[in-house]
């Protein structure tokens, strides 16, 4: 039931940065729909469905 002691060791700067970058890949700004919207590639109907 006790966590291993290694769980209490702080991440290195590089590990911390990598964990943040890995987490960021899941953000909505990278979703294909959002990318198409940002690039102006959505049809009027697609954009209206998103707004509704």
UniProtKB/Swiss-Prot annotation:
GO terms for molecular function: pyrroloquinoline-quinone synthase activity. The keyword Protein transport does not apply. It catalyses: 6-(2-amino-2-carboxyethyl)-7,8-dioxo-1,2,3,4,7,8-hexahydroquinoline-2,4-dicarboxylate + 3 O2 = pyrroloquinoline quinone + 2 H2O2 + 2 H2O + H(+). Keywords: Oxidoreductase, PQQ biosynthesis. Pathway: Cofactor biosynthesis; pyrroloquinoline quinone biosynthesis. The keyword Oxidoreductase applies. It comes from the Bacteria. Belongs to the PqqC family. InterPro entries: Haem_Oase-like_multi-hlx, Thiaminase-2/PQQC. Ring cyclization and eight-electron oxidation of 3a-(2-amino-2-carboxyethyl)-4,5-dioxo-4,5,6,7,8,9-hexahydroquinoline-7,9-dicarboxylic-acid to PQQ. It comes from Methylobacillus flagellatus. This is Pyrroloquinoline-quinone synthase. GO terms for biological process: pyrroloquinoline quinone biosynthetic process; sulfur compound metabolic process. Its EC number is 1.3.3.11.
């Amino acid at each position: 039931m006790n966590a291993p002691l290694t769980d209490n060791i702080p991440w290195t700067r590089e590990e911390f940065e990598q964990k943040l970058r890995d987490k960021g890949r899941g953000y909505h700004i990278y979703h294909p729909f959002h990318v198409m919207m940002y690039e102006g590639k959505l049809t009027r109907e697609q954009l209206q469905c998103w707004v509704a």
